[in-house]
Amino acid sequence: MSQQVIIFDTTLRDGEQALQASLSVKEKLQIALALERMGVDVMEVGFPVSSPGDFESVQTIARQVKNSRVCALARCVEKDIDVAAESLKVAEAFRIHTFIATSPMHIATKLRSTLDEVIERAIYMVKRARNYTDDVEFSCEDAGRTPIADLARVVEAAINAGATTINIPDTVGYTMPFEFAGIISGLYERVPNIDKAIISVHTHDDLGLAVGNSLAAVHAGARQVEGAMNGIGERAGNCSLEEVIMAIKVRKDILNVHTAINHQEIWRTSQLVSQICNMPIPANKAIVGSGAFAHSSGIHQDGVLKNRENYEIMTPESIGLNQIQLNLTSRSGRAAVKHRMDEMGYKESEYNLDNLYDAFLKLADKKGQVFDYDLEALAFIGKQQEEPEHFRLDYFSVQSGSNDIATAAVKLACGEEVKAEVANGNGPVDAVYQAINRITDYNVELVKYSLTAKGHGKDALGQVDIVANYNGRRFHGVGLATDIVESSAKAMVHVLNNIWRAAEVEKELQRKAQHNENNKETV
């Protein structure tokens, strides 16, 4: 009988570590809701003790996500576990994931400890986590380079202490699939109480083997796979969840397992993660790349036309990549837009219908027809600019030519005041940025600029993603418009608002800290 493999998503924790700029709470919530809609069993959404921002994101997601188990990471440190529990307690049920290194190298050089001390610490911390929840995951960091006898000792002790999931990470992407399968098999042979926990795997792609290692582990008995959408993560990335999920579906004949994933949401979730994280998907990426279902060879094209199964082991429709519909125009009403969003699986609570419809009408007047991908871009990329604003683009105008110096005039609303500046630059975008810098006096340093067409043809929406440095921190901004210069200006204004919000959060934290200090003095 087919057994279920639990899908544990760590896009918002391990995946986010690879990003050039941190995501906002609202951006993380958007991704979390998409993952919930896709049907992931568990989502690891942050490391609460690491920062107030991470704590807030975990708490916000734990409060709103209902159909997936929300999890937070904690080292084998008392404060980590206590803070993780505090951030998660708003959820009806939650998981705490705690970890400690087990390989001889890590124990000796990083922890400066012994295996016996590591086991003792693991037991204590698992028991501490169990005081808060009956769902505790324990990870043996660098398990791939841990002798099997040592690993078995740690695993047995953690299960006895109350761990309900034991995670075996290939932390540095070192093992071969046959080796990794051997580790899982070895644990089943050596750990007497292994039937009391679910065995999980967490692989990295340093040698390009993350998916292969995860599937080999599943074949050997692992029943949870951890990974990130699009394989994002530190260094070469994490195990690509969409690849593992579809491999399990397509090769059920060999693996004899299944997942609870809604496969129709894979493509949409992948695209959303790519857009929000500002990480384009390579065209040749398995499952979700733009070329994944493209056939350019004449022989292949002929074979596909005769029977798609000649060269396709799965269909675009199986991951939710359906034919684009041309059913919305400037004459479409608000109800029609809502109906189309409903058909695509989006809840009204995930977007602002009034704002979406206003943006839709403006775009429809310019383009004539509005596609599904246009609606998604307006609803979710545009949504990032709907957060409370201190800065707002009021007006811009540029003059440039092949032999002229680019000049930009910009009006920016700064709180209640509207300010204007004119500046020259190396091209129209640079001129606009110079004018904005003069208005705000922030003097941000542009680190990355990318432009992506959202749609097809000359009237496609242009999405500009930028990363900028300010006071030693990196901030991400996104802008969306049919005009590239306007998209660029909106992206910079988004960065400025993110900087302003970060400063406001810092002020609030300082205010609370001072308030607590005053209360202590009073007592």
From Swiss-Prot:
Coiled coil: none annotated. Pathway: Amino-acid biosynthesis; L-leucine biosynthesis; L-leucine from 3-methyl-2-oxobutanoate: step 1/4. Mn(2+) binds at residues 14, 202, 204, 238. Residues 392-523 are annotated as: Regulatory domain. InterPro entries: 2-IPM_HCS-like (IPR050073), 2-isopropylmalate_synth_dimer (IPR013709), AIPM/Hcit_synth_CS (IPR002034), Aldolase_TIM (IPR013785), LeuA/HCS_post-cat (IPR054691), LeuA_allosteric_dom_sf (IPR036230), LeuA_bact_synth (IPR005671), PYR_CT (IPR000891). Gene3D superfamilies: 1.10.238.260, 3.30.160.270, Aldolase class I. GO terms for molecular function: 2-isopropylmalate synthase activity; acetyl-CoA C-acetyltransferase activity; manganese ion binding. CDD domains: DRE_TIM_IPMS. Its EC number is 2.3.3.13. The keyword Transferase applies. The keyword Acetylation does not apply. It catalyses: 3-methyl-2-oxobutanoate + acetyl-CoA + H2O = (2S)-2-isopropylmalate + CoA + H(+). Homodimer. Catalyzes the condensation of the acetyl group of acetyl-CoA with 3-methyl-2-oxobutanoate (2-ketoisovalerate) to form 3-carboxy-3-hydroxy-4-methylpentanoate (2-isopropylmalate). HAMAP family: LeuA_type1 (MF_01025). Belongs to the alpha-IPM synthase/homocitrate synthase family. LeuA type 1 subfamily. This is 2-isopropylmalate synthase. It comes from Escherichia coli O127:H6 (strain E2348/69 / EPEC). The gene is leuA.
